C-alpha cells in the first residue's frame, strides 16, 4: 500500500483527510497517468449517495478538466456500473467516488483503467509520486484545449440492460426482497428486478445523503432477514453502499454469505460446463466448510490475500472465471471486471429459478464451521502485527488447534484495525481463541 492508495483506492474522512484539495490533485495527476497517450481523453465519474460525493466530484472534475480530459458524469451508480461502462463506452479511465461499506463520514476515490480493471500498484505509485511532487510540471492546456464536462445519467440503464443479458430466465412468480443500503443501487436494483417480472419489495432504498449503510445493507443483513420473514419473501438480497457486494437471505431468514453464494454458483457453472479449469478463487477468510463442499463436488480452490483486487489478479493471471470473498464480493470474470452485487444477485436467483429449489436447500449443501471475527482498534496496525507478544499468542493458539481449525490475524486495508478470526469445531472454542489473541493486542497496542 502507498501513502494515499490503500487496498481499494484512496479513502479517508471526507473534508478532513480526503479534502477537495487532495481530490483535485488526484483528478489532475490520476487523469494524466491514465490518459497521457490520448489526445482528447474521456473519463467517466460515478458516485454513491454520500453527502460528500458532490464536493469530491466537483474537485475531481476540475482536476481532470485542467489536463484536458473530457468528463462524463454518470451521477449515482454502482462501482461495477462504472467499471462496465468505462470499457463499454471506450473511455480511457473511470472513477468511482465511494467508501463502499464504510460510515457516511468516510469517502473514497478509486480508478479503473480502459479495460475496466482497477489500477496496478505501479500505476498507483506513479500517481502518488506526481501528487507529492514539489512542483506541478503537468500540462496546462488553455482555450479550446481545456476539457469539458457532460452528464450521461442514462449510463445506469445501459448497464442494467447489459446485466439482464447474462441470465436465461425472468423471475415471474418470485417475491424478492431487496436491501439497497440507502446506497448506489437504491433505484437501479428495484428497477432491474421489477423489469424481470419479480414481485419486488424494498428496504434501505431511501438515501438522504447521510443514511448510507446505517443499520442496513450487506454489513447488517439481520435487518433484511427480519424483513424477509415478515413479508414472506422467497429470497432477500442485500447490497452494500456502492453495490459491489451481495449477501443473501433465504426464505427462512437465514443469512447466506459470500462463501455459500460462491459454492452455489461454482456447482452450477460446473454442471453446465462453464467453470473454467474447475477452479474457484477465494481469500484466506473463506470458511473451511467452503473448501470441503467444493472438494466434494470435484472443484479445486485457490487462495489469495484478503481484497477483491487480489482475487481478480489471480483470476486474470491463471484464466479462472469465478472468485470472490466471504464478505460478498463475487467476481464473474466472463461478465464484469470487479465484484458486482446486482450481477451476483441475478446469477443466484437465476439458479434458484432453473433448479426450482429454495435458497435454504441450495445453501444447506455447504456446512459452515463456526467462525468468529473480532476487530481490535489499534494505534498502529503494522506495529501490532510485528509485536512479539502478539506473535507469541498466535503461535500458542495454532499449536493448540493442532490442525482442527485455524486462526487468521491481519490488519485492515482501510481502517486502523487488526482483524482476529478463528474457526474451530465449536463456537465456544472460537470465542476462547479469538478473545485470547484480541486481549493481547488490546493490552499491547490498543486505543484507550
Curated annotation (Swiss-Prot):
One of its GO terms (cellular component) is cytosol. Binds 1 Mg(2+) ion per subunit. Activated by phosphorylation. It comes from the Bacteria. GO terms for molecular function: magnesium ion binding; phosphoglucosamine mutase activity; phosphomannomutase activity. Mg(2+) binds at residues 100, 240, 242, 244. Keywords: Isomerase, Magnesium, Metal-binding, Phosphoprotein. Its EC number is 5.4.2.10. The modification Phosphoserine is found at residue 100. InterPro entries: A-D-PHexomutase_a/b/a-I, A-D-PHexomutase_a/b/a-I/II/III, A-D-PHexomutase_a/b/a-II, A-D-PHexomutase_a/b/a-III, A-D-PHexomutase_C, A-D-PHexomutase_C_sf, A-D-PHexomutase_CS, Alpha-D-phosphohexomutase_SF. Its cofactor is Mg(2+). The active site is at 100 (phosphoserine intermediate). Belongs to the phosphohexose mutase family. Catalyzes the conversion of glucosamine-6-phosphate to glucosamine-1-phosphate. NCBIfam families: glmM, PRK10887.1. This is Phosphoglucosamine mutase.
Amino acid at each position: 500500500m502507498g501513502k494515499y492508495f490503500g487496498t481499494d483506492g484512496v479513502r479517508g474522512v471526507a473534508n478532513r483527510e480526503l479534502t477537495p484539495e487532495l481530490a483535485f490533485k488526484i483528478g489532475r495527476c490520476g487523469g494524466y497517468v491514465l490518459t497521457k497517450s490520448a489526445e482528447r481523453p474521456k473519463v467517466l465519474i460515478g458516485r454513491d449517495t454520500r453527502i460528500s460525493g458532490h464536493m469530491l466530484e466537483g474537485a475531481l472534475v476540475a482536476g481532470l478538466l485542467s489536463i484536458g480530459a473530457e468528463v462524463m458524469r454518470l451521477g449515482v451508480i454502482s462501482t461495477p456500473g462504472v467499471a462496465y461502462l468505462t470499457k463499454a463506452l471506450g473511455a480511457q479511465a473511470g472513477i468511482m467516488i465511494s467508501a463502499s461499506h464504510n460510515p457516511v463520514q468516510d469517502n473514497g476515490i478509486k480508478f479503473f483503467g480502459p479495460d475496466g480493471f482497477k489500477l496496478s500498484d505501479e500505476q498507483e505509485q506513479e500517481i502518488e509520486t506526481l501528487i507529492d511532487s514539489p512542483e506541478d510540471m503537468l500540462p496546462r492546456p488553455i482555450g479550446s484545449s481545456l476539457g469539458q464536462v457532460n452528464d450521461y445519467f442514462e449510463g445506469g440503464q445501459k448497464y442494467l440492460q447489459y446485466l439482464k443479458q447474462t441470465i436465461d430466465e425472468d423471475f415471474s412468480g418470485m417475491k424478492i426482497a431487496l436491501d439497497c443500503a440507502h446506497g448506489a443501487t437504491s433505484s437501479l436494483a428495484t428497477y432491474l428486478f421489477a423489469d424481470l417480472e419479480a414481485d419486488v419489495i424494498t428496504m434501505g432504498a431511501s438515501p438522504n445523503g447521510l443514511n448510507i449503510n446505517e443499520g442496513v445493507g450487506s454489513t447488517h443483513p439481520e435487518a433484511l432477514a427480519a424483513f424477509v420473514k415478515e413479508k414472506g419473501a422467497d429470497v432477500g438480497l442485500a447490497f452494500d453502499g456502492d453495490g459491489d457486494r451481495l449477501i443473501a437471505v433465504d426464505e427462512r431468514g437465514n443469512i447466506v454469505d459470500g462463501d455459500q453464494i460462491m459454492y452455489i454458483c461454482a456447482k452450477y457453472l460446473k454442471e453446465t460446463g462453464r467453470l473454467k479449469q474447475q477452479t474457484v478463487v477465494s481469500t484466506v477468510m473463506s470458511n473451511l466448510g467452503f473448501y470441503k463442499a467444493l472438494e466434494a463436488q470435484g472443484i479445486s480452490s485457490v487462495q489469495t490475500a484478503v481484497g477483491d483486487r487480489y482475487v481478480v489478479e489471480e483470476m486474470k493471471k491463471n484464466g479462472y472465471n469465478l472468485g470472490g470473498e466471504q464478505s460478498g464480493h463475487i467476481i464473474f470474470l466472463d461478465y464484469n471486471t470487479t465484484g458486482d452485487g446486482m450481477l451476483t444477485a441475478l446469477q443466484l436467483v437465476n439458479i434458484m429459478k432453473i433448479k426450482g429449489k429454495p435458497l435454504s436447500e441450495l445453501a444447506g449443501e455447504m456446512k459452515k464451521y463456526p467462525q468468529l471475527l473480532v476487530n481490535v482498534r489499534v494505534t498502529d496496525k503494522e506495529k501490532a502485527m510485528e509485536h512479539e507478544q502478539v506473535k507469541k499468542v498466535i503461535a500458542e493458539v495454532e499449536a493448540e488447534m493442532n490442525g482442527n481449525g485455524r486462526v487468521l490475524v491481519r490488519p485492515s486495508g482501510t481502517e486502523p484495525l487488526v482483524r482476529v478470526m478463528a474457526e474451530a469445531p465449536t463456537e465456544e472454542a472460537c470465542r476462547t481463541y479469538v478473545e485470547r489473541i484480541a486481549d493481547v493486542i488490546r493490552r499491547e497496542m490498543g486505543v484507550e
